[in-house]
């Protein structure tokens, strides 16, 4: 297994060069991964919120935000500051402990999942070797927070929203996991680094989307349902449930739901990029680029190009999927709850299971194409 660059070891070696002991260097390192993840996630949310506002405005033939900074780029910051200073209200008959714990359980697992996302060649905070398994385990915690929030609010609309969120998540978690298992089966690894490296042979032709088109579609549909994006926003349908499980929330507790939703959307887009679109891989193999430039593959220029373009490609692929998700919000009608559950249990689940069995058969029959 390619472990990639050990960021902790490199950081400790740099601090040792300044005369610090390994124990002190380790203590300084401990909060840094989460700090890096938090900063990356918050910046990603700010960009996504601005994109959603501008794309939504364009879809409705409006201008969108334009006064808060150039082209309204400061509007997401203004939204965050507004929520920060709003009063934090707990309903009179609500369970205050569960009411407060719910938003935390929604946000924390999503942020922790970012630890296993490689943003570029050898650029990964924690390559635990079972990154995909860890992400599936963490994603199963979020519905508990949603159900807890709906139950603790002492509001019928909130409770219905929480129940819908739990039912929706359970229905789509299984086909989501089965579609990922097909990719894991071809790679023989649960590491996100190994999954991307397995797609790096022939540029765009090596990407898993060609070998797993059905899995790609199932994963994207399930990811949208897990993120509660239209047409799957049943838990917070404004016309039916006011705001669903968020109805009684205000201030920073509401902001945690808001933040968690967008962080989950970006995370899902990044995982689609890693699992099916080659991650940091450039559509043209680096060997061809080096040959055109008449440079050896290990030349410093090629190494710098590979590292730089890797981060750019990962982010570009992810935001292309975010763009598609935003467009779907304004171009598709909301499904009913019975239609949503039927889609998950009667269609996606058997298709994803059949796709996994087909992948196993093709792996035995054509090991050179499906990971022998």
UniProtKB/Swiss-Prot annotation:
Subunit-structure text: NDH-1 is composed of at least 11 different subunits.
Family label: Belongs to the complex I subunit 1 family.
GO biological process: aerobic respiration; photosynthesis, light reaction
Protein name: NAD(P)H-quinone oxidoreductase subunit 1
Membrane topology (UniProt): Multi-pass membrane protein
InterPro entries (UniProt xref): NADH_UbQ_OxRdtase_su1/FPO, NADH_UbQ_OxRdtase_su1_CS
EC category: translocase
GO cellular component: plasma membrane-derived thylakoid membrane
Transmembrane regions listed in the UniProt entry: 27-47, 97-117, 128-148, 176-196, 204-224, 266-286, 308-328, 347-367
Entry-linked NCBIfam families: PRK06076.1-2, PRK06076.1-5
Task of the protein: NDH-1 shuttles electrons from an unknown electron donor, via FMN and iron-sulfur (Fe-S) centers, to quinones in the respiratory and/or the photosynthetic chain. The immediate electron acceptor for the enzyme in this species is believed to be plastoquinone. Couples the redox reaction to proton translocation, and thus conserves the redox energy in a proton gradient.
Compartments, as annotated in UniProt: Cellular thylakoid membrane
Catalyzed reactions: a plastoquinone + NADH + (n+1) H(+)(in) = a plastoquinol + NAD(+) + n H(+)(out); a plastoquinone + NADPH + (n+1) H(+)(in) = a plastoquinol + NADP(+) + n H(+)(out)
EC code: 7.1.1.-
Pfam families recorded: NADHdh
Gene: ndhA
């Amino acid at each position: 297994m390619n472990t990639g660059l050990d960021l902790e070891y490199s950081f400790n070696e740099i601090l040792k060069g300044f005369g610090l002991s390994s124990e002190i260097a380790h203590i300084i390192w401990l909060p840094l991964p989460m700090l890096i993840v938090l900063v990356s996630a918050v910046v990603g949310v700010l960009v996504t919120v601005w994109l959603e506002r501008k794309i939504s405005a364009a879809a409705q033939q409006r201008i969108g935000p334009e006064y808060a900074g150039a082209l309204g780029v400061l509007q997401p910051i203004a939204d965050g500051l507004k929520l920060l200073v709003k009063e934090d209200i707990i309903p009179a008959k609500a369970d205050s402990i569960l009411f407060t714990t719910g938003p935390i359980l929604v946000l924390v697992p999503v942020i922790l999942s970012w630890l296993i996302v490689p943003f570029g060649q050898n650029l990964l905070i924690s390559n635990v070797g079972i990154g995909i398994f860890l992400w599936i385990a963490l994603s199963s915690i979020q519905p508990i927070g949603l159900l807890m929030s709906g139950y603790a609010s002492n509001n019928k609309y909130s409770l219905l929203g929480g129940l819908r969120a739990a039912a929706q998540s359970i229905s789509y978690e299984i086909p989501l996991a089965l579609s990922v298992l097909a990719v894991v089966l071809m790679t023989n690894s649960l590491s996100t680094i190994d999954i991307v490296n397995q797609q790096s042979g022939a540029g765009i032709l090596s990407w898993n989307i060609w070998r797993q088109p059905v899995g790609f579609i199932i994963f994207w549909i399930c990811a949208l349902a897990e993120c509660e994006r239209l047409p799957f926003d049943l838990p917070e349908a404004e016309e039916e449930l006011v705001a669903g499980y968020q109805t009684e929330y205000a201030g920073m507790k509401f902001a945690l739901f808001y933040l968690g939703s967008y962080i989950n959307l970006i995370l899902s887009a990044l995982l689609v990029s890693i699992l099916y679109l080659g991650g940091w891989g450039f559509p043209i193999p680096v060997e061809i680029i080096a040959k055109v430039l008449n440079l050896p593959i290990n030349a410093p220029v090629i190494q710098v190009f590979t590292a730089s373009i890797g981060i750019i490609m990962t982010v570009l692929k992810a935001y292309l999927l975010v763009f598609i998700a935003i467009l779907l919000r304004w171009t598709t009608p909301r499904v009913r709850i019975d239609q949503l559950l039927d889609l998950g249990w009667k269609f996606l689940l058997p298709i994803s299971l059949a796709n996994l069995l087909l992948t196993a058969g093709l792996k035995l029959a054509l090991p050179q194409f499906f990971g022998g």
